[in-house]
Curated annotation (Swiss-Prot):
Motif Nuclear export signal, chain ranges: 137-146
Region entry RNA-binding and homodimerization, spans: 1-73
GN (gene name): NS
Family: Belongs to the influenza A viruses NS1 family.
Chief subcellular location: host cell
Protein name per its UniProtKB record: Non-structural protein 1
CPSF4-binding: region residues: 180-215
Keyword entries, A-Z: Eukaryotic host gene expression shutoff by virus, Host cytoplasm, Host gene expression shutoff by virus, Host mRNA suppression by virus, Host nucleus, Host-virus interaction, Inhibition of host innate immune response by virus, Inhibition of host interferon signaling pathway by virus, Inhibition of host PKR by virus, Inhibition of host pre-mRNA processing by virus, Inhibition of host RIG-I by virus, Inhibition of host RLR pathway by virus, Interferon antiviral system evasion, RNA-binding, Ubl conjugation, Viral immunoevasion
Domain remarks in the Swiss-Prot or TrEMBL record: The dsRNA-binding region is required for suppression of RNA silencing.
Length: 230
């Protein structure tokens, strides 16, 4: 006799037992109860054909189902633990830098997906650094909390923030938003730098030197900035 035939019968017996307990609590509707009665007759016929006791088969079916559920629970638990252990928060900005109010002389605002990009177009010929606080999971940017653009003097001149009304964004969304902000700031001949932490997680591909690859114009700006610092 095929072992799959027996184990299938055992599982069917246990599942019928669960459905019967459900019906005993007067929770089943008419179609449910009708199927229950028909399945009971079917199980009795199969038990006779297989020469298997229904009560014994029900207990064996319970063990099979419990093993399956235990395995699924263990795998789900392992994935949950792995996710929690892999989740971490990275902070370029202090609490003061995150909470500080700022004003724009020539405000420009753009919405890209679920992210809002704001910048001051009055800023010219400045060296600007982008800093961000965000969460990372499995070495990928998961959620942007806040990104701000600072001048060397510490003034805030740009910002990217999630829109509360449109929750959820990907690392690609953040990358695109950063590109928009950089492009807007560079338009007025500002030199834009990106924090090392943000570079690592906002751009996943790397150049030959192991640094995250940036758009060509951004590469030129960063090269000039590096030369001036040496």
């Amino acid at each position: 006799m095929d072992s799959n035939t027996v184990s299938s019968f055992q599982v069917d017996c246990f599942l019928w037992h669960v459905r019967n307990r459900f019906a005993d609590q007067e929770l089943g509707d008419a179609p449910f109860l009708d199927r229950l009665r028909r399945d009971q007759k079917s199980l009795r016929g199969r038990a006779s054909t297989l020469g298997v006791d229904i009560e014994t088969a029900t207990r064996a079916g319970k063990q099979i189902v419990e093993r399956i559920m235990e395995k699924e629970f263990d795998e789900a638990l392992k994935m949950t633990i792995a996710s929690l252990s892999a989740l971490r928060y990275l902070t370029d900005m202090t609490l003061e830098e995150m909470s500080r109010d700022w004003f724009m002389l020539m405000p420009k605002q753009k919405v890209a997906g679920s992210l809002c990009i704001r910048m001051d177009q009055a800023i010219m010929d400045k060296t600007i650094i982008l800093k961000a606080n965000f969460s990372v999971i499995f070495d990928r940017l998961e959620t942007l909390i806040l990104l701000r653009a600072f001048t060397e003097e510490g003034a805030i001149v740009g910002e990217i923030s999630p829109l509360p009304s449109l929750p959820g964004h990907t690392d690609e969304d953040v990358k695109n938003a950063i590109g928009v902000l950089i492009g807007g700031l560079e338009w007025n001949d500002n030199t834009v730098r990106v924090s090392e932490t943000l570079q690592r997680f906002a751009w996943r591909s790397s150049d030959e030197g192991g640094r995250p690859s940036l758009p060509p114009k951004q590469k030129r700006k960063m090269a000039r900035t590096t030369e001036s610092e040496v």
